């Protein structure tokens, strides 16, 4: 009898996990589009500027443009980037800036920086603009070329694949 219960337990557990996969698309609606040149990085003197602005109505090469707010109900999107500084031995090491000034959008700073684009007051444009004041030295910026909607609850999450 114990052997029968043991086999029955294994069979039930197997049936429960048969339908589980690692694909989020089965559980959450996602939409991925590609639009180039949405993240801009520029330097002037000791100030590095990172910006990312795009219209709420996104033309991405399809016949019908995508209304990001109606699709996601999200007032914010984000992308991640990190910085590295060359040390005295010539090696690149991770650098976390301490002087960030966001004129549009917001930042979340950890081991990398999350640039958060926010929908403007007129609900027409998602905006992000940040200046980073740097001390003398050589720097490089590594940008993850993916912009993702934040807080898309019970609706579609949109991912914008882009270039810098």
Question: What kind of feature is each model-predicted range?
Answer:
Residues 36-43:
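Short beta-strand segments of immunoglobulin-like
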Residues 46-50:
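Structural beta-strand segments of beta-rich domains
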Residues 3-10:
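Sec-dependent signal peptide recognition
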Residues 21-23:
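Bacterial signal peptide processing site
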Residues 58-138, 145:
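Structured domain cores in non-transmembrane regions
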Residues 126-130, 138-164:
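Glycine-rich, aromatic-bearing surface loops/beta-hairpins
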Residues 16-19:
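C-terminal motif of bacterial Sec signal peptides marking the signal peptidase cleavage site
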Residues 51-55:
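Short edge beta-strand/loop segments characteristic of extracellular beta-sandwich folds
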């Amino acid at each position: 009898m114990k052997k029968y219960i043991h086999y029955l337990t294994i069979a039930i557990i197997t049936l429960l996990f048969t339908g589980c996969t690692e694909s989020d698309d089965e559980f959450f609606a996602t939409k991925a589009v590609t639009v180039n040149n949405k993240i801009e990085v520029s330097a002037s003197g000791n100030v590095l500027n990172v910006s990312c602005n795009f219209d709420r109505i996104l033309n991405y090469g399809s016949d019908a443009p995508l209304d990001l707010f109606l699709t996601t109900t999200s007032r914010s999107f984000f992308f991640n980037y990190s910085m590295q500084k060359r040390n005295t031995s010539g090696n690149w090491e991770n650098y976390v800036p301490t002087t960030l000034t966001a004129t549009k959008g917001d930042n979340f700073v950890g081991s990398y920086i999350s640039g958060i684009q926010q929908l403007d007051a007129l609900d027409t444009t998602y905006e992000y603009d940040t200046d980073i004041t740097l001390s003398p030295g050589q720097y490089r910026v590594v940008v993850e070329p993916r912009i993702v909607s934040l807080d898309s609850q019970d609706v579609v999450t949109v991912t914008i694949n882009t270039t810098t």
